[in-house]
Amino acid sequence: MNGHDSCVLVTGGFDPIHGGHIDYFQDAKLLSTYLIVGVNSDEWLRRKKGRPFMSWESRKRIIDQMNIVDYVIDFDDSDGSANDAIEQCLKDFDKVIFCNGGDRKEDNIPEYEKYKNNKRVEFKYSVGGGKTESSSELLNA
């Protein structure tokens, strides 16, 4: 998967994927030439929402077909973090730029404590602008 020194990593359930996610991907891609999308597992969604609306395979297939996306990974951290996705990227890249959407900050993401002193991990916030749509709200409308 490599050939690049750094990657930008975005993570989420993307269940279902919507326009706000596209903004998130496009904004993130401006930070590095290699965009990796970490898609939460079905088990993660069961713990968070009760059940997935779309299977991991379906979500992965849709995201994988987007020209802006270079690689899709799955991950499942029982603590609600994306630490597993970050670790997967650190195996192949010298630097990981971990992006967070508009509603996330260093004081409300579990990954910050683990990686705040790791010079190979850089945190970016408000990527993709403010939260304009919510998958949960779309499903409950």
Predicted regions and their residues:
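Nucleotidyltransferase catalytic core that binds NTPs
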Residues: 1-141
